[in-house]
Amino acid sequence: GQVIAAGGELKNTFCIGVDNRFYPSPYVGDLEDLRTVKALKETIGRLETLLEVQPEVVVCDLHPKYNSTVVAQELGLPVLKVQHHYAHILSCMAENDCEEKVIGVSFDGTGYGTDGTIWGGEILIADYQGFTRLGSIQPFVQVGGDVSAKEGWRIAVSLIWQNTGDLEKTLDTVQKLGLCTEQEAKVLVTMAQRKLNAVTSTSAGRLFDGVSAILGIRRASTFEGEASTALEFAAEAWRAQEIQKKNVDTVSGERTDIKRNVETTG
């Protein structure tokens, strides 16, 4: 059969499958820009003409508001929607010629879940026929929509409020950490309580952004993944320091070379 997979919303590429052969498209880009959406439609048409194919079905992300989903639905073909994190696991299975049922761990930014919440830290039991959601990271309230992906301090305030359950404790902690003003914190807590522009999320990426802000590493990101990456680098640096400390005999002050198991001076 012939199938077209519409690709993701960010860093989009699509793919046309003909029986057991697959033809990925050139890089298209982020579909938040309408010019890129237009380029996606044009590139789909050109690749279909080049390959002389007429796809019978189109596959797209489960998110109803993704432009990739909208484009897929406009093709006039039967649409098969696949959950974002299930797709990640399927790609790993296909790459490794895995035909068995697996326990898949999929941690990333955000993806639309089958329950209408935002997923991103998932453990799924999966095969090519479907999946069962076995578990996830603890859900939290993500306030501010897409803005919170760039401003991790918003996630931080939400995490603090969720874990204290008390407005005054939240305001006190936020003030000590210098995350935002008292008024901003009050607004975010109110939004979380009333579910105003707030969604339940299990996104590992957003959790890392929030923790990065709480630890004073990055309050916000100026480019994609900045806060999470900075958190990773800080953790690696701390780990390196801990390993270095353990390699020094605190009594004699002599350093032990682990690889050769010999003592060195200095």
Sequence positions of predicted segments:
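Short acidic/glycine-rich loops and adjacent helix/strand connectors
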Residues: 1-249, 253, 257-266
